[in-house]
Amino acid sequence: MSDIIPVFLGADLNCYNFARAFHEAYGVESYAYGRYPMAPTKYSKIIHFTTVPDMDNEDTMLRILHEFAAQHKGKQLYLFGCTDDYAAMIIRRKAELTEYIAPGPAADLYGSIQKKAEFYEVCEKFGIPYPDSKILTAPVDAAELTEDKLGFAYPIIVKPSSSVDYWKHPFDTMKKVYTAATPAEAAEIVKTIYASGYPDRMVLQKMVPGGDDHMRVLTAFSDENGKVRAMCLGHTMVEEHTPHGLGNHAAIVSEDTTSLPLVENIRKMLEACRYTGFSNFDIKYSGIPGDYRVFEINLRQGRSNYYVTATGMNIARLVVEKWNDGGTDCVLNKNEVFWHHVPAQVAFTYTEDKDLVARAKALKAQGKEACSLLYKPDLLWNPVRYACVLEQLRRQFKKFKTYYPVHK
């Protein structure tokens, strides 16, 4: 398998998790390109990162990738985007990247489901519950956002329908997701986002009760024929709470995937759409038995994808061995593993569900635990990387103390 060469666009934890999976499975090193280096991949021996300041320009991307392919003729090249923007670029220009195997949905399908508003329309067809929502196409007065007009009570969630377009229009108070306590606050958030130049729809949504530990994450892999070949459910312990990182998983306990009532409907939806590649769903349990609400679909592997690999379902092997093997089997993970990218003690301290903490501690005691950055082959005889990783982990204590005070 030495002919395998993974290539990533991005340098974040998503990139490191996937590169680690390839290294574990096949002993190969990965290549990555991005606009700037990032801590999760700095000084790594398993990733060769190159800074390209305008890597978000599609013509630059094509030039770099064609040059790389020309230098590695005869190799089995795999290409993945590690952010929404990079994934979208690859999907749009996939027809011009024939040197690579680039698992991902067709461009027309991408256009129809990557935005939350459109995705909810698809969910309707397949009986997949999502939070009650109001869609806006422009700023409105607070009088139009009363509870009577919305059909649900405050506080509410406010977020852009298109994450890709949203992050292209930065402003000082920018957040990944917003909470509004009053109609006036909701109207002001919407006004500010549209004033930045954001061109798409806005989603105002009923708040689903419960903390981070009510969240679930579902990862699916579909082969080139649109058959779902693997699914893995994770129970979120705690998420990041920095303004730009809000909602990113910090610790997950993987669970029996068959325990999620929505799994079969989601599989049917993916296959009916002939979806290909990785998909990642954010889901929340409302506290009512059996009531789970899907928030969104990410049309790529998730940032926390190592929670899947840690169960034994190595995501690199899924791509290499199931993408075009002609099979139809679908493996649903049932193994429990405690995954985290923050120190375990941070996860234990800030997870409010103490029964879930007890499960995670038991898994840790059994050796069923994985921390993305603590990869021995990348740390051995690599003191600078080791120091960098320790510093990243150390800083998590301050981040959580600042942005997520312990609930007493």
Question: Each predicted region: which residue ranges?
Answer:
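ATP-binding N-terminal substructure of ATP-dependent carboxylate-amine bond-forming enzymes
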Residues: 1-105, 140-145, 389, 399-406
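Short glycine-enriched loops at secondary-structure junctions
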Residues: 34-39, 84-86, 224-227, 234-237, ...
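Active-site nucleotide/adenylate-binding loops and adjacent lid/helix of ATP-dependent enzymes
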Residues: 112-203, 224-225
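ATP-dependent carboxylate/phosphate-activation module, predominantly the ATP-grasp catalytic core
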Residues: 175, 181-184, 206-274, 298-323
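A short glycine-rich, hydrophobically flanked beta-strand micro-motif that places a catalytic Asp/Glu
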Residues: 205-206, 276-288
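A short beta-strand motif that forms the metal-chelation/ATP-contact edge
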Residues: 290-300
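Peripheral (often C-terminal) accessory segments that flank ATP-dependent C-N-forming ligase machineries
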Residues: 321-408
